[in-house]
Amino acid sequence: MVRRRQRLPEVDMGLVSFEDVAVDFTWQEWQELDAAQRTLYRDVMLENYRSLVWLGHCLAKPELISKLEEGFEPWGVAEATEQCLPGVRKWSAPVEKGQQSQEKYLRQVKIIKKNTPDEDKVEVENTYNVDSNCISNMTLKNEVCSRVFFQELVNPLLDVPLPTEAGERQSTEVPHDLNRTQEVLSYPKHFTHHSKDQYSQCCFQYFGPDEAFHTKAILTPEMFYVQETSRTCNNYDKSFDEVTIPAQYMTQLRKQTLGWNICHKIFPNKTELSNHDAMHTGENDDKCDYEKPIINKSLYLTKHQEAHAGIEPQAHKENIKFFCLDAELQTVDPELHGEKQVYECKVSGKTFRHQPEHISQQRPHACERACQAKEHGEAGCDEPALTQHQRLCTEEKACEGKACSKAFHHKSLLPQYQSARADEQQSDCKELMKIYFYVSSPTQHHGPPPPEKPFRCNDCLKTFSHKSQLERHQRMHTGEKPHECKECRKAFCHKSHLIRHQGIHAPEKPYECNECKKSFYLRSQLTLHERTHTGEKPFECKECRKAFSRNSHLTQHQKIHTGEKPHKCKECGNAFARKSHLIQHQKTHTGERPYECKECRKAFSRKSQLMQHETTHTGERAYECKECRKTFYLKAYLTRHQVIHQSEKPFECKKCGKAFSRKSYLTRHQKIHKGQTLSG
């Protein structure tokens, strides 16, 4: 039974097909278009096709639309080679023009029943004025499912002989021995799938000498006369026996194409030739050595036959997880022929027809990333690669640390971890036994951080947990300053110090203090400054309970208790706890006094001395004691004064235990003990 969308009138008005609104470019014109013009062309063609589909005037998807949807250019290799070989003889017959009009209306045919009886063919003949011989030659029958399909065109070479230089050849029939199924399974791909709908679209495909595959064959009937051999699905014996090509173009043609020696099919690139090669040799590039599941990359006919034969896509037998790299194979409905898919979840026992549903359903069963595959039947790894999935099932850890028995899936992580433990204690990490999948730093566990600090400084024997911390620390000993300010050429050992320094040169300082209206370049600088107004001191020394507003001040203070003095003067050998103290001390050897008073031109070696001196000119006393309202020039004076109100005496003599409120008092007192020692 044939459904007519509308009766074709005998006047000029008729059904609109995609070819009526399509815009064609020659190969030379297409090369002159830029990327934007090609994108515009693609968008316009796709929009026209969608409009025709919505109106019901385009049942079969044109080859041009299939190429544009997949991101390919509308020009195949055949047309490009035709432009490159202008001397090749072209052939056309009067019957070709008549068949063009027949082909135009055949695109509107739609099959309703699974079989097409003779009366339906007669109706097609009467409706569309198509010759009965064309109808018989255009129908193919599937012996398994009794589906009938039309071919898009009748081979124009069947009845019209063409003399060639090698002699006269012609073909009178086109046998289609497809063994178990004779369904037309070729490009465009969406026509190759069975549908459970009542109305199944025809698969219009031209089966002439230029049979369409994923890549259009370079030998077309318009260019060469080709005798076509029988098409069988046994080893894909599709071939072109004789081709009449002028000898002067054979060398150029061989350079531009890659051909397969068994079936003489020609491909535009090496990748497609390799894929086709594996089809003949039976090789499968993507296979699991453990289970050897098949990853089939063959054409659509083989895919359909596998559905009849019950062949499953590549499966992992251990947990019934399927890895199908050909998405088109999943769309063949096995229930149409009474077959059943065996997509089974080993945990829940559910079965699925389509692999994506099966995989998404199994993911919730995964306990954790590193759990064994045998425990739950499905590895909770999102990696699609079969070898990576197999590595979970076999519990393969190719790289193992000999010192602590830690295992790594990736070889690149092992030397990083071994170098971290090379200079430190070889403690046993068998308690952890952590498996690292994707860790940027293997020395950092996902759980609590390890107690050891394997990176040690050779100068001061200080240890660090990360190598970057050690490198940053060593700059303090070497004096290296790789970060330089482009404005004043001042160098810094840390990048954070450079960023903080660049605020001096910044024209805008967006962060302003609400108390004193002083502005800052960084938000962190404003936060530190605000603590001078609020008196907040969140950092407290655990030894003497002294608090500080900055963590750096606490770190410097703690060196008093530890006695650490890493900064040593090369001139006199004196050591200092702070680098700033060393710099100030070195100026006593050089005599440098860079800080000069603008009022009296007096110079000082320290900036604090200059600031203290400038208050004698201005009379400003910015620091006031909240207890007695006494003001001071410097904050240090205020701090020393506040000890009087607090009755605090933090400086204690180790000899006699006497305490003092100021360090200068303690220093003066210690001289008494030194004098007693010398006199004794």
From Swiss-Prot:
Q: Which residue windows are transmembrane per the record?
A: none
Q: Name one GO cellular component term.
A: nucleus
**Which Pfam family, an example, fits this chain?**
zf-C2H2
Its induction, per UniProt? Up-regulated during osteogenic differentiation.
Its keywords, alphabetically, are: Metal-binding, Nucleus, Repeat, Ubl conjugation, Zinc, Zinc-finger
Per the annotation, which location comes first and is thus the protein's main one? nucleus
PTM per Swiss-Prot/TrEMBL: Polyubiquitinated, leading to its degradation via the ubiquitin-proteasome pathway.
| Keyword Zinc-finger set for record | yes
GO-annotated biological processes: negative regulation of DNA-templated transcription; regulation of osteoblast differentiation
The KRAB domain covers: 16-87
ZnF C2H2-type: positions? 263-280, 455-477, 483-505, 511-533, 539-561, 567-589, 595-617, 623-645, 651-673
Q: Tell me the tissue specificity.
A: Expressed during osteogenic differentiation where levels increase from the first days of differentiation and remain high during the whole process. Highly expressed in lung.
Any one GO molecular-function label of the UniProt entry: zinc ion binding
Subcellular location, record wording: Nucleus
- Tell me, in a sentence or two, what this protein's role is: May modulate osteogenic differentiation, at least in part, through the bone morphogenetic protein (BMP) signaling pathway, increasing RUNX2 activation and leading to osteoblast commitment and maturation.
Protein name per the record: Zinc finger protein OBI1
Naturally occurring in which organism (per UniProt): Mus musculus
**Organism lineage:** Eukaryota, Metazoa, Chordata, Craniata, Vertebrata
